[in-house]
């Protein structure tokens, strides 16, 4: 069973991912952004932890579709150093989500 601490870590990671997708997705990832926001709203809801996990597991796979999902998302910036930093931060947040969700998927 997922702990409340893990829910909060997921929430923080999804918030960071949502900010990056919103800022650097240039409108092409609106569907993914809606799923991320749904994840956050689910975590914040009054539903039972079991119901939350059911939703989080179901929608997790939609985030990493073969085309147009978070696995395809790359942040571009003309400044190579900044681009590398942003993509590293993005990848760290994706790994953070995976490290929590992998035991439940």
Annotate each language-model stretch with its function.
Residues 1-2, 9, 28, 45-52, ...:
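Alpha-helix capping and helix-coil boundary motifs
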Residues 1-37, 91-105:
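Short terminal alpha-helical segments
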Residues 22-71:
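Amphipathic alpha-helical interaction modules
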Residues 62-105:
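Amphipathic alpha-helical binding modules
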């Amino acid at each position: 069973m997922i702990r409340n601490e893990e829910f909060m870590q997921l929430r923080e990671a999804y918030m960071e991912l949502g900010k990056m997708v919103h800022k650097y997705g240039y409108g092409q990832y609106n569907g993914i952004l809606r799923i991320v926001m749904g994840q956050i709203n689910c975590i914040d809801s009054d539903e039972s932890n079991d119901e939350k996990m059911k939703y989080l597991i179901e929608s997790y796979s939609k985030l990493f579709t073969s085309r147009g999902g978070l696995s395809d998302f790359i942040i571009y910036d003309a400044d190579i150093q900044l681009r590398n930093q942003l993509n590293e931060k993005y990848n760290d947040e994706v790994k953070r989500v995976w490290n929590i969700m992998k035991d439940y998927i």
